[in-house]
């Protein structure tokens, strides 16, 4: 990120003063691990995971991003929530499926989803390896990749469309968001792909 640890701590303290409870920060690794916030209330080291859920009030579930897409989930009764870090690696590997499964095992019936700001489909140039990583989603995934003219083996990937496909595959069809691009909206969002050395945005969800 390029920021001094003291500045990060100061910013997080300021953010905490505006929140109803302590956020449980994660050590995000582009994986699929999901943790329950209620198991990490003691202020220990950040859990190594890419999704966090809450089954009760008294904590905040944050996800840090700067091109990867934050995905917020909640059951319609409002007593279960989760936040997931959905870059292409985590999305292809199952971070959303794992998060939805954990919510369902905790009692969620109908789940709503919101896709936060991430790299948009006109800016996310990828190679054949990324396209291949989503083959398991079937023919519908192919429409999320548009070949780049004059660049064999290169595609523009639609991360929100892929997220919607993944969500639909696990029964989540009420999905909002996914229309903000971190790369293009320079004055609004941090972007690692655009700036390399940059800050991170925190997207959060909690139970009242």
Task: Briefly describe each language-model feature range.
Residues 1-208:
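Active-site microenvironment for binding and transforming phosphate-containing groups
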């Amino acid at each position: 990120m390029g920021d001094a640890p003291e500045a990060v701590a100061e910013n997080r303290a300021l953010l905490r003063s505006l929140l109803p409870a302590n956020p449980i920060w994660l050590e995000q690794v582009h994986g699929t691990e999901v943790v329950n916030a209620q198991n990490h209330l003691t202020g220990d080291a950040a859990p190594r995971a890419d999704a966090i859920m809450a089954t009760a009030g008294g904590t905040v579930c944050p996800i840090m991003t700067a091109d990867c897409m934050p995905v917020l989930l909640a059951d319609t009764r409002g007593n279960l929530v989760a936040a997931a870090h959905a870059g292409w690696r985590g999305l292809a590997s199952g971070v959303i499926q794992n998060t939805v499964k954990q919510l369902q095992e905790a009692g969620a019936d109908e789940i709503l989803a919101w896709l936060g700001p991430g790299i948009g489909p006109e800016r996310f140039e990828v190679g054949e390896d990324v396209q291949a990583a989503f083959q398991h989603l079937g023919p519908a995934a192919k429409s999320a990749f548009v070949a780049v003219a004059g660049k064999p083996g290169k595609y523009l990937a639609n991360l929100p469309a892929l997220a919607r496909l993944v969500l639909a595959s696990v029964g989540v069809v009420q999905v909002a968001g996914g229309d903000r691009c971190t790369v293009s909206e320079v004055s609004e969002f941090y972007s690692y792909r655009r700036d390399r050395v940059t800050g991170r945005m925190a997207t959060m969800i909690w139970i009242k």
